[in-house]
């Protein structure tokens, strides 16, 4: 499935506090709405990896820039996934969505789970998800904010010179097509276009907070790679057991799991009870 950014359109809505929430739309405009939560860092352009499968599986794709990423306004103060349902509600209102599935990739996982507190959310899918409290290099660096921001600024600059492969190599060891590499790189650069404060804020939350499993009362399914070196498998398995959800292992790494299971994940999340 070849990513095609032209299959996405960018829209925006104004939230009750005056902030702008930007988002991409794609897939089947008459399909079942699914809100996709990009990684950390990430942006609405992540939707380019999913627009083709969404059209084929009858999914109406909505991919918001979380606050501080892409074209969305930064939050006024400290903000984390616990505050996300209110913003999501603004998006669902703007798009006149009465019922939707949600899907979270990598750092988008905690936000997808938080979204389940909105009674319009029917199902939650997680692909290569982070499970706070996270114990990894980024979580450690988040305790030194300027160091984390500097690392991503340097990574962004190096990738701008070296090309898409410099971004892709952070997420997978496999060889991917040029369109996939370009889509991954475009998502990364758009995420950091206005700096790295959003990625710093999210990683700080990942390191210090825990998920509230009791707030999730809808079906949950996770797909996770057995060779994922970005987000460990065992915390996801434990979380899914706690949620009484469904867990599927994939013989792939971080990005590879998404590429191999994106159509299946969209189809499951959009499935009506």
PLM features: residue spans?
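Catalytic histidine-centered segment of alpha/beta-hydrolase-like enzymes
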Residues: 230, 250-266
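Flexible "cap/lid" loop of the alpha/beta hydrolase fold
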Residues: 123-154
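Conserved alpha/beta-hydrolase "acid-adjacent" motif
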Residues: 229-235
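Conserved alpha/beta-hydrolase
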Residues: 54-74
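The serine-hydrolase catalytic nucleophile loop
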Residues: 39-52
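Short beta-strand/loop motif that positions the catalytic acidic residue
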Residues: 216, 222-224, 228
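Conserved acidic catalytic loop of the alpha/beta-hydrolase fold
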Residues: 82-101
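Alpha/beta-hydrolase
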Residues: 149-212
